[in-house]
Amino acid sequence: MTICEWPTTPLYQDYHDYEWGRPIHDDQHQFEHLCLESLQCGLSWLMILNKRNIIRECFDHFDIDAVAAYGESDIEHIMQTEGMLKYRPKIEAIINNAAAFKRIQSEFGSFCNYIWGFTNHKTIIYENHPEGHFPTKNGLSTRISKDLKQRGFKFVGPVTIYSHLQASGLINDHGKDCPCFKEINKTADIVRLPVDDEA
């Protein structure tokens, strides 16, 4: 059997083997992945993984309540942290998104209830994706992106959201010969669907 081709470093390999595509049903981990995907806009994912520990420290290990309460002094502290990504609009967006995240929790009981509701609480396997062909965005990610933006989220475009859906296991985009593809399918409630307005 062969794994997916994109993990090119040991750190990337660990992320592929133990995180990417594994269904997340915990709000804090959903928030962490969404923040990391938002930070990644325009950057490489490997850079984000390399800075992940610094990012975690800057954002109180993605404590949603803590991040939602951040003020100017917290932003300045993050901006001055050595090794941290220093693009202020993204930092401000994470703080903004924490507050929006909490509003969703209040409305739906949890963010997981909200986002998994878009897939009827199933992990999607799209036609042709197990052959190694998957898009940067699709109809599902566009719909979720639009809804999140209407709820006040920032830096959550369709491409970012598609990556989030892959990472958090709402879509299983591992190749069919990758052991992770089969492992996830054994434990997840899956549904096979035709492609959805892909780009």
Question: For the regions a protein language model found, what residue spans apply to each?
Answer:
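HhH-family (HhH-GPD) DNA N-glycosylase catalytic core used in base-excision repair
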Residues: 1-199
